[in-house]
Amino acid sequence: MSDNITSARATARFVRVSPMKARRVIDLVRGKTVVEALSILKYAPQAASEPVAKVVASAAANAENNFGLDPRTLVISEAYADEGPTMRRFQPRAQGRAFQIRKRSSHITVVVESQKEGAN
């Protein structure tokens, strides 16, 4: 195995957005270049697009600063949202009942890989 590192990752943990909603946004950018993904996320109407964009930008910055990779050649090779801890709240209802409210959180992970210029 060669010593050339061609990928970098970034993770945002305990993000207060449900994993299903985060996955909906992540599916838009998986396999795209970092520049293309950030422009898609900038105009995506979903609330989860902001934390996903932050993680994509962080992964690109990690690749550039830690491994010296060119940010223009980076492609999102892996992106996923895992379920984080769920906060449970109770909402009082009629006749002494209480309904449970689940405030879900997620862990968003993005892996970027350097792709050769001629591979496009």
From Swiss-Prot:
Entry's Gene Ontology cellular component terms: cytosolic large ribosomal subunit
GO BP of this protein: translation
Family annotation (Pfam families): Ribosomal_L22
InterPro entries: Ribosomal_uL22, Ribosomal_uL22_bac/chlpt-type, Ribosomal_uL22_bac/org-type, Ribosomal_uL22_CS, Ribosomal_uL22_sf
Single annotated GO MF: rRNA binding
PROSITE patterns the record matches: RIBOSOMAL_L22
Swiss-Prot/TrEMBL keywords: Ribonucleoprotein, Ribosomal protein, RNA-binding, rRNA-binding
Signal peptide per UniProt: none
Assembly notes: Part of the 50S ribosomal subunit.
Family: Belongs to the universal ribosomal protein uL22 family.
Function per UniProt: This protein binds specifically to 23S rRNA; its binding is stimulated by other ribosomal proteins, e.g. L4, L17, and L20. It is important during the early stages of 50S assembly. It makes multiple contacts with different domains of the 23S rRNA in the assembled 50S subunit and ribosome. The globular domain of the protein is located near the polypeptide exit tunnel on the outside of the subunit, while an extended beta-hairpin is found that lines the wall of the exit tunnel in the center of the 70S ribosome.
Protein name: Large ribosomal subunit protein uL22
Lineage: Bacteria, Bacillati, Actinomycetota, Actinomycetes, Mycobacteriales
